[in-house]
């Protein structure tokens, strides 16, 4: 076996045909990070017949006195269950890096440690604890089961698969389902952006991360060449908001009148308690509908063409989507734009045949007892 440096094209050819591939081990991601404080190496291990058996992108950070450290994002591209192959690759990689003044290299492999439910409890399914044990055995230092976002990539990720629109919707909590319905009633619609939309997108997400505008401009330029990134916006269509608000008001007004009629017809009855309760509930709902009509009318006067209220960036690769970052205008929070945005994006890609949806990193604070 021999470890060699390969071209970006050779690496991409290997990565594209590798079974367990991921977005972070691509030429495109390497090119992006090359513009943002890292250098990039593309390495492969080949056998005596010249066949590549493993490969990795290494991002390189230079330190003082010529020393460096490396990071293999979600790497390597290797069969982690083949311990002999893994050990050989590690030895060759160590030799390669030592010759080039590397102090260390970090890895966070794209493997699931154990299957867990949404509360973090271990459930029957995947168990890759033997891989972790083997990595430690051959010289890797395990930095621990972090709970938050201490590492370069989050440990905890919310991932879902779905078979139908109904199945997808049912997977959300009752609270989120209600917010999605609310956004729909208030005239939120989804628009797709392009390279010219990046500045508008950035204005909605700049407070959520330290990345600057240039990072997203570069991302759209580099990943856009391979159709790996999409920008989506949530727009409050104020004309539609008025229309829907009036429709809901008229429907509730009709229902309220019917309850009034029912109450008049049963005024001398001893069985009016339930009718009165329904009347009180309808009065509250009718008043809310009226306020929505007033609010929609005022918004239409201010934004006759509608207003962008939320945005989300999505990475698409290998029939998976990754929600990279999202944001919304705080003053329009009550319209639940990002809940609706995420749901509609997920439903769109489900119909396009995408099988896994990564909802981005989550904290493990509520899972301290199950690390």
What are these regions (language model features)?
Residues 83-84, 112-129:
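Short, flexible/disordered intra-domain loops and linkers
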Residues 370:
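Conserved small/polar residues in nucleotide/adenosyl-binding loops
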Residues 63-68, 80, 112-117, 241-243, ...:
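Short catalytic/ligand-binding loop motif for oxyanion handling, primarily in non-cytosolic enzymes
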Residues 84-95, 334-347:
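Conserved acetyl-CoA-binding loop-helix of GNAT-fold acetyltransferases
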Residues 71:
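Catalytic phosphate/metal-binding cores of nucleic-acid and nucleotide-processing enzymes, i.e., regions
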Residues 102-119, 141-158:
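Short, glycine/charge-rich beta-strand/loop segments that flank catalytic centers
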Residues 4-49, 55-66, 139-151, 163-166, ...:
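A conserved beta-strand-loop-helix scaffold within acyl/acetyltransferase catalytic domains
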């Amino acid at each position: 076996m021999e470890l060699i440096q390969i071209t970006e094209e050779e690496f991409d050819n290997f990565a594209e045909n590798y079974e367990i591939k991921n977005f972070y081990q691509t030429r495109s991601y390497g090119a992006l990070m090359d513009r943002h404080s890292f250098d990039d190496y593309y390495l492969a291990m080949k056998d005596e017949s010249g066949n590549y058996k493993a490969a990795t992108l290494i991002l390189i950070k230079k330190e003082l006195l010529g020393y460096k450290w490396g990071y293999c994002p979600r790497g390597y591209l290797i069969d982690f269950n083949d311990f002999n192959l893994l050990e050989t690759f590690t030895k060759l990689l160590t030799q390669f890096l030592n010759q080039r003044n590397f102090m260390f290299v970090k890895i966070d492999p794209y493997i699931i440690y154990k299957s867990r439910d949404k509360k973090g409890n271990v459930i029957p399914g995947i168990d890759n604890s033997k891989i972790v044990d083997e990595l430690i055995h051959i010289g890797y230092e395990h930095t621990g089961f972090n709970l938050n976002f201490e590492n370069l990539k989050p440990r905890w990720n919310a991932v879902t698969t779905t078979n139908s629109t109904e199945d997808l919707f049912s997977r959300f909590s009752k609270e989120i389902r209600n917010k999605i319905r609310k956004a729909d009633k208030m005239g939120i619609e989804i628009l797709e952006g392009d390279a010219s939309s990046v500045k508008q997108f950035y204005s909605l997400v700049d407070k959520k991360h330290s990345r600057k505008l240039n990072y997203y401009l570069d991302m759209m330029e580099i990943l856009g060449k391979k159709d790996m990134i999409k920008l989506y916006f949530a727009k409050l269509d104020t004309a539609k908001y008025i229309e829907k608000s009036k429709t809901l008001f008229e429907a509730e007004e009709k229902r309220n009148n019917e309850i009034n009629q029912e109450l008049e017809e049963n005024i001398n009855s001893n069985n009016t308690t339930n009718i009165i309760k329904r009347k009180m509930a309808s009065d509250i709902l009718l008043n809310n509908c009226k306020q929505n009509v007033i609010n929609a009318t005022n918004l239409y006067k201010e934004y006759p063409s509608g207003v962008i209220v939320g945005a989300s960036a999505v990475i698409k690769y290998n029939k998976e989507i990754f929600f990279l970052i999202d944001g919304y205008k705080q003053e329009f929070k009550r319209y639940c734009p990002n809940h609706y945005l995420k749901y509609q994006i997920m439903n769109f890609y489900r119909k396009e045949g995408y099988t896994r949806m990564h909802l981005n990193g989550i904290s493990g604070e509520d899972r301290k007892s199950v690390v």
